Amino acid sequence: MASFLRFRLSASLKPYITFGRMLYTRIDKDGLTMLAGHLAYVSLLSLVPLVTVIFALFAAFPMFADISIKLKAFIFTNFMPATGDIIQNYLEQFVANSNRMTVVGTCGLIVTALLLIYSVDSVLNIIWRSKVHRSLVFSFAVYWMVLTLGPILVGASMVISSYLLSLQWLANARVDSMIDETLRLFPLLISWVSFWLLYSVVPTVRVPAQDALIGALVAALFFELGKKGFTMYITLFPSYQLIYGVLAVIPILFLWVYWSWCIVLLGAEITVTLGEYRAQRHQAITEKSPSQSQEI
């Protein structure tokens, strides 16, 4: 009986073990940590230009003033844990200084911001082993759309949430508590949708929607857990402040950006491996069927 249970258990776990091995092999072959380090470096170079371009676009349209404020609070609270206030102060100073830049300097900012999106595009297509290249005009259009429409859609969704909370018929204890619990999941939902779009749109090959959704969900869950774990580490083990002093925000920001890219690329690797695992199983079944028919 015990041997039968062990056999059933090993048989039920075999697909997960096989998938785990395939995933580990792929991560090791692609050099996930090196790719994440590359993106972290480019992100730090592009962070100020990216934030400057985004909020300059909001400033150009007065109707987006409320969205800009809500989006700032959302980004620094949910995407830069524990050090959001300090980094926000520095970035706001940089953005204020950029207003005095010339046209050439402004174009340089935009190019640097687009460089990050180009790097993400290149790395994801390396993971997908894609050899298809988009035209320069199409790529620029996609990058510009991501740069402009992405923050606006996130900010608009937050404004809609605030509007729903202000409605009179929702001023009810039970409904209010339900909405409060739902809004707690809002950052997770935003991360999930963002990662799903990233894995679906950026690669130049067709990505099954189901695989992209699963990979994006895993990445979003790890991202939310990573935020809590990172905040806990900074709060409980503040020894980095004794070493770096006032410069402590620099290594903290770099570590968080690096960890975030590791999570994003892990979700991409899971998405790709799901498709490869399915293809491998289909091939095994196809090869097994003719041999069975010959025996008959």
From Swiss-Prot:
Question: Keyword 4Fe-4S on this protein?
Answer: no
**What cystine linkages occur within this chain?**
none
Q: Which UniProt keywords apply?
A: Cell inner membrane, Cell membrane, Membrane, Transmembrane, Transmembrane helix
Q: Where are the transmembrane segments?
A: 44-64, 67-87, 108-128, 136-156, 185-205, 212-232, 246-266
Q: Which GO terms describe its cellular component?
A: plasma membrane
Name the principal localization, coarsely classed.
membrane
InterPro entries per UniProt: UPF0761_bac (IPR023679), Virul_fac_BrkB (IPR017039)
Compartment annotation: Cell inner membrane
Pfam (any one): Virul_fac_BrkB
Give the source's domain of life in one word: Bacteria
Q: What is this protein identified as?
A: UPF0761 membrane protein YE0031
